Design a protein with these regions (language model features):
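TRNA-recognition modules of translation machinery and tRNA-sensing kinases, especially anticodon-binding
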Residues: 2-227
Length: 227
């Protein structure tokens, strides 16, 4: 048999390519992170459930080092080292204390995006993500944005797509970057921005009608060779 590229690698590369086509650069960061980069810098309050040991995999007793729960940490590191404007996507693995079920895994793949510039609005965010959705799922796909909450964006939204059976399915979260996040990296208040995050397994499961996330990790050649 010949060799096959893993379906998650293929989907990740496609998503990166779509955003690269409109000027986004790719940024990377460490999987073992500080609590500051993962939570504090992203405006996550001390009481937020995401900080609990039941949700996050900590690497020390002081709860100061952890396996990142999101690739937003890369956005913080990039802004610490680069002046605005910023247009980046951050792909990579993330880790959470999830029990394995049909749609959850303690390790999964995510791509987060960040745009920081002068005069960016929610309309720019909406246009960017609608472009992505149509490039990935097809030009006839319907989308809608519904209000949501994330600590690091305000206002925040979830993006839903109308699937073949008429059901609306959530595919990603997004919003305008909270001013506190920009202040934490010493960006001038003349800059604004938006951010989003999407799960690669989620996209692959929808596109290819895969019913259980474990299929990606079992190395069954009968599954992998379909892609």
């Amino acid at each position: 048999r010949g060799s096959y590229k893993h379906v998650l690698s293929t989907v990740m590369e496609e998503v990166v390519s779509i955003f690269s086509s409109i000027g986004y650069e790719v940024a990377y960061g460490p999987e073992a992170e500080t609590s500051w980069h993962n939570f504090d810098a992203l405006n996550t309050p001390d009481w937020h459930p995401a900080r609990y040991e039941s949700d996050t995999l900590y690497l020390d007793k002081n709860l100061e080092t952890l396996l990142r729960t999101q690739t937003s940490t890369v956005q913080i590191r990039h802004m610490e080292e680069n002046d605005p404007p910023v247009y980046i996507v951050a792909p990579g693995r993330v880790f959470r204390s999830d029990q394995l079920d049909a749609t959850h895994s303690p390790v999964f793949h995510q791509l987060e995006g960040l745009a920081i510039d002068k005069n960016l609005t929610f309309t720019d965010l909406k246009g960017t993500l609608e472009f992505f959705v149509k490039e990935f799922f097809g030009s006839d796909i319907e989308t809608k944005f519904i209000p949501h909450f994330f600590p690091f964006t305000e206002p925040s939204a979830e993006v839903l797509v109308k699937w073949q059976n008429g059901e609306w399915l959530e595919i990603l979260g997004c919003g305008m970057v909270d001013p506190n996040v920009l202040s934490n990296v010493s960006y001038p208040d003349t800059y604004k921005g938006f951010a989003w995050g999407v799960g690669i397994e989620r996209l692959a499961m929808l596109r290819y009608n895969i019913d259980h996330i474990k299929n990606f990790y079992e190395n069954d050649i009968r599954f992998l060779e379909q892609f």
